[in-house]
Design a protein with these regions (language model features):
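Intrinsically disordered, low-complexity interaction hubs enriched in FG repeats
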Residues: 147, 154-157, 166-183
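Amphipathic/hydrophobic helical signal segments and adjacent flexible N-terminal regions
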Residues: 7-21, 29-86, 171-216
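Central antiparallel beta-sheet cores of small beta-barrel/beta-sandwich binding domains
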Residues: 55-56, 63, 70-157, 165
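Extended, compositionally biased low-complexity polar/Lys-Gly-rich tracts
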Residues: 89-104, 152-154, 163-166, 183-208
Length: 216
């Protein structure tokens, strides 16, 4: 009996290796959606011009976390606690972090509309931020703690919520509609861990750096 269970898991792992490699998940960011209109507003993001003007005007007074960043991610899929596959994307996207009230909002650097709402909030501990993310497609919310290192690197991680797993493993893809996949997700036996690494763009002349990155 034990042999059959192990064999079944191995078969599932082989299937999900193929599945995860075909899994072109668009990275969702995350924020705390206090109001419905807040969500609607941030669908549209900020324009390049608005961000350029902000960084140019405030270049000498920016908070440590503010600026332009490149984001990388390491994704690891687990099934029944067994690591199936790990894949990395070192330069997933370029993002801008801008202070708005008590929040540090996250925007796509190129000004394109966003499919997520995300922000950092400073804590009482230096270099530690609360990160919140609202997935607009699935209406899932995640939160975690982010570490700012040397004012130039951000690091945090979390597991993809069940709504995301359902969308990309059960409702779509080669195993669309699979009852076995649905059961594994609902039982919490499928876990997709995301580790995020942000690296800040740094230059002696920060204004020129911002403008160059925005125009590229």
């Amino acid at each position: 009996m034990k042999y059959m269970v192990v064999l079944k898991i191995r078969i599932m792992i082989n299937q999900h290796i193929k599945l995860v490699l075909s899994f072109a998940l668009v990275l969702f960011g995350c924020i705390n959606p206090l109001y419905e209109e807040d969500i609607e507003e941030f669908y549209h993001g900020k324009t390049k011009e608005e961000m350029m003007n902000y960084f140019s005007k405030n270049k000498d007074n920016l908070e440590a976390i503010e600026g332009l960043w490149t984001l990388g991610v390491i994704r690891t899929l687990y099934i029944y606690g067994i690591k199936v596959v790990t894949e990395s994307e070192p330069n997933r996207m370029d993002l801008a972090v801008i202070k708005e009230g008590d929040l540090f909002r996250i925007y796509k650097m190129n000004g394109d509309p966003i499919s997520f709402i995300a922000s950092f909030t400073q804590t009482d501990e230096s270099g530690i931020y609360d990160y919140k993310c609202y997935f607009t497609d699935t209406k899932d919310m995640v939160s975690t703690t982010a570490n700012l290192l040397d004012n130039s690197m951000l690091r945090y991680e979390y597991d993809a919520p069940k709504g995301i797993l359902m969308n990309y493993y059960y409702k779509a893809g080669p195993y669309k509609g699979s009852k076995e996949v649905k059961r594994i997700i609902e039982d919490g036996n499928m876990r997709l861990n995301w580790k995020f690494f942000w690296f800040k763009y740094v230059s002696i002349d920060s204004t020129k750096t911002y403008l160059a990155r925005m125009d590229s």
